Amino acid sequence: MEWTKVTVATVNEAVEAIANILTEAGAEGIQIEDASINDTLVGDVAAVSAFFPETVFVPEKLPLIRQRVLQLTEFGLSIGEGSVNLQQVADDDWATAWKKYYQPTRLTRFLTVVPSWTDYQPTDEREALIRMDPGMAFGTGTHPTTHLSVQMLEMVLRGGEQLIDVGTGSGVLSIAAAHLGVQDIRAYDVDQVAVDAAVANFDLNPVTQGIIAKPNDLLHGITGAADVIVANMLPVVLVPLIPQVPALLKEGGHLLLAGIITEKEAVIRETLSANGLMVEESLHMGDWVGLITRLKTDED
């Protein structure tokens, strides 16, 4: 069987958004390369490759893929070169070659993302493993925004909480939360493919038993308050999400936001303030920002 490989030349800032575009176009596998794993790429340059089966006529989809990649600039994302190229590859070429680029990655002192096919063992008795299958697309769980999200979870969780994961994608944040002692986790994503990918990853991690994963558009129609709501999404999605949060956030609870590029931080802060939320702490990694927020009180 032959596959069609579509590669988008871009920068790190846009890799997850482009991966989602390619997945929605019908890709069955995603490969992300940057300077840390490919020495032909320099600085912030990255490449996102997607693999389409023979049943998908890719040339017909290319114009829309190119259009959607270019539209990312309207959301404040830099896409770098933004070129889109395709080539034919044999089944064996992509089915194994991409795995060498995906290695165990320490997200925090105690949480490590591990490819599902490795026999990696914890180096510390306190180290917990998040096993992931990036063949499901929706990222490998190693993007800076994921690092920020998991760091924020470690900062606010004490165990026993109720948590809502909005835009769960690969499910990595729900898995991390389960490792950190959260008792009740609800994971939502507007895309059924993402929900299926998350459930597949949950199955790789016994600690996630009991997580509820369903398709849903942000928090529309959701009932039942939570101690923590976490969302790692682009600002264009976070802005309409924020007004939905106060009704579902328990007193003393936290809203954790990631996926925010530095230039959009002010817009997010303004939206938070307008909806009765305030920033308690901010974290930074490169051009990305993570915000730990809570409901305002009479004392604020």
Curated annotation (Swiss-Prot):
Subcellular compartments: Cytoplasm
InterPro entries from the UniProt entry: Ribosomal_L11_MeTrfase_PrmA, Ribosomal_PrmA_MeTrfase, SAM-dependent_MTases_sf
Main location per the UniProt record: cytoplasm
EC number: 2.1.1.-
Swiss-Prot/TrEMBL catalytic activity: L-lysyl-[protein] + 3 S-adenosyl-L-methionine = N(6),N(6),N(6)-trimethyl-L-lysyl-[protein] + 3 S-adenosyl-L-homocysteine + 3 H(+)
Gene Ontology process terms (BP): methylation
UniProt keyword annotation of Ribosomal protein present: no
One GO MF term attached to the UniProt entry: protein-lysine N-methyltransferase activity
Binding-site residues for S-adenosyl-L-methionine, renumbered to this chain: T146, G167, D189, N232
UniProt keyword terms in alphabetical order: Cytoplasm, Methyltransferase, S-adenosyl-L-methionine, Transferase
GO CC terms: cytoplasm
Top-rank taxon, per record: Bacteria
Keyword Cytoplasm: yes
Function statement: Methylates ribosomal protein L11.
Similarity-based family: Belongs to the methyltransferase superfamily. PrmA family.
Name assigned to this protein: Ribosomal protein L11 methyltransferase
Originating organism: Latilactobacillus sakei subsp. sakei (strain 23K)
